[in-house]
Amino acid sequence: MFSIEKNVKNEIIINKSKFITYLIRIEKIEDVKEQIDIIKSINKDATHYCYAYILNSVKHFSDDGEPSGTAGMPMLNVLENNKLNHILAITVRYFGGIKLGAGGLVRAYTKSVTSTLDIASIIKIDFGYSFKISCNFDKKTLVENLISNLKIENIFFDNKVNYTLNCNKEQFEIVKDLLNKNEIEIQELKEVIIKSE
């Protein structure tokens, strides 16, 4: 599975119409509406807000008033052809006064997403876990040896040493067993998308 490493924006002009495409990494379906609302608030005077997204097995698109099949579907095709997932493409169009016709719109929306992908950093992604562990100071060295192969997102100290970690599912199963054997409790476990090495 592939996605973008970070969100990216690009703008092209075709026959006086401005096409601004945003590629946004999404984790859950609620992200789609939230991101579309944000883009609409930034581009209040735009004529169309077309989009396509892929989130696991869910795929959806919208032409937002453009002729049927001329905007959202071509955008979705670009995402599918690049084997992307957990991604939302929103293309905002400011009409420039020249009608492009159905074929011209398909080419314009395709080019807008493709040219934005050209400047994006594409990464391989995998399902994994984010979790926290805490230990007493006397177990700090032991814990750090047990988690040495994991990505440590954060370490903070209070009356204990607290770690926030990310890892893939296979790593998690191994580390979970090691932590349990050493009586170190896993907290706030949640499934996340991680960059695959």
For the regions a language model picked out, list residue spans one by one.
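Non-DNA-binding regulatory cores of transcription-related proteins
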Residues: 151-172
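C-terminal regulatory domains involved in ligand/effector binding and gene-expression control
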Residues: 1-70, 154-156, 169, 181-197
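Short Lys/Arg-rich amphipathic alpha-helical segments
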Residues: 80-85, 107-123, 164
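Short amphipathic alpha-helix segments
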Residues: 133-151, 174-176
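Short beta-strand-to-loop capping motifs
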Residues: 24-27, 133-137, 164-170
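Short glycine-/aliphatic-rich beta-strand segments at the starts of folded cytosolic domains
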Residues: 121-137
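Glycine- and acidic-rich phosphate- and metal-coordinating loops
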Residues: 53-54, 85-95
